[in-house]
C-alpha cells in the first residue's frame, strides 16, 4: 500500500513541477497593465473659404449662312455576317436516352415487380407504373426504369437486366436492341 501512495505522490510532484515549469517558461506577465484611454479629440470644423468666381468673357461668333447643298443618298452595302449561325437539326423527342421522369416517382413500379415475383399477395395493377412511361420512347422508358433499379428506388435487390425486361414486358414495351443497363 505504501508503494501505491509513494507512486501517486511522485506522479503528483512530477506533474506539479511540469506545470510550473511550463507556465514560468512562457514569460507571461500575470497582471497586464491596462491600456491608457485615448483622449477624445473634439472635431473642429474647418472654415469654408469661398472660391472666387471669375466670369468668362463673352466672344461673339459671326453668323455666316451656310450654302444649301443637297446631300446625295447613297445606299449602304449589306455586309454578310462574319460568323454564320450553324443550322441545328431538330431533335426528335425521346431519342436521347435521357430520363425525363424523376426516378423517385418510379417507386410505384415496385408493387408491380414485387407482385410479379410473388412477394406480395394479390395482383397489383401495373397501371400506375405503365402510365408513367406511357408517353416515352422505348429507349427512354428503359433508361428510366434502369435508373430506378440501379438506384434501388424500388427497394428490391434483384438482377437488374431481368427486372428491367419484366417491367417493360408488363407495360407492353420492348427492350431496345443492344441496350445494356450499366
From Swiss-Prot:
InterPro entries: Bifun_inhib/LTP/seed_sf (IPR036312), Bifunc_inhib/LTP/seed_store (IPR016140), Hydrophob_seed_dom (IPR027923), Plant_LTP/defense-related (IPR051636). Disruption phenotype: Reduced cutin accumulation due to lower cutin biosynthesis. Early flowering in long-day conditions. It comes from the Eukaryota. Residues 33-94 are annotated as: Disordered. Residues 1-25 form the signal peptide. Its main location: secreted. Residues 42-81 are annotated as: 7 X 5 AA repeats of P-[KS]-V-P-[ST]. Residues 33-92 have a biased composition (Pro residues). Induction: Transient accumulation in response to a brief exposures to cold. Keywords: Cell wall, Plant defense, Repeat, Secreted, Signal. It is found in: Secreted, Cell wall. Sequence repeats lie at residues 42-46, 47-51, 52-56, 62-66, 67-71, 72-76, 77-81. GO terms for biological process: defense response to fungus. Transmembrane segments: none annotated. One of its GO terms (cellular component) is plasmodesma. Probable lipid transfer protein (LTP). May improve freezing survival. Seems to control the flowering process and lignin synthesis. Confers resistance to Botrytis cinerea. Belongs to the plant LTP family. PEARLI1 subfamily. PANTHER family: PTHR31731. This is pEARLI1-like lipid transfer protein 2. It comes from Arabidopsis thaliana. The lineage of its organism: Eukaryota, Viridiplantae, Streptophyta, Embryophyta, Tracheophyta.
Amino acid at each position: 500500500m505504501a508503494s501505491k501512495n509513494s507512486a501517486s505522490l511522485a506522479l503528483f510532484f512530477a506533474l506539479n513541477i511540469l506545470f510550473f515549469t511550463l507556465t514560468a517558461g512562457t514569460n507571461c506577465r500575470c497582471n497586464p497593465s491596462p491600456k491608457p484611454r485615448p483622449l477624445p479629440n473634439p472635431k473642429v470644423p474647418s472654415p469654408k473659404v469661398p472660391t472666387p468666381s471669375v466670369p468668362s468673357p463673352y466672344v461673339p461668333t459671326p453668323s455666316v449662312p451656310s450654302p444649301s447643298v443637297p446631300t446625295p443618298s447613297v445606299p449602304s452595302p449589306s455586309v454578310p455576317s462574319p460568323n454564320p449561325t450553324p443550322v441545328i437539326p431538330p431533335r426528335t423527342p425521346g431519342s436521347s436516352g435521357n430520363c425525363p421522369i424523376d426516378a423517385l416517382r418510379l417507386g410505384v413500379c415496385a408493387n408491380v415487380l414485387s407482385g410479379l415475383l410473388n412477394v406480395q399477395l394479390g395482383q397489383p395493377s401495373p397501371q400506375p407504373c405503365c402510365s408513367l412511361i406511357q408517353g416515352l420512347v422505348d429507349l427512354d422508358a428503359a433508361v428510366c426504369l434502369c435508373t430506378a433499379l440501379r438506384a434501388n428506388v424500388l427497394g428490391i435487390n434483384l438482377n437488374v437486366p431481368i427486372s428491367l425486361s419484366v417491367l417493360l414486358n408488363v407495360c407492353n414495351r420492348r427492350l431496345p436492341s443492344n441496350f445494356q443497363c450499366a
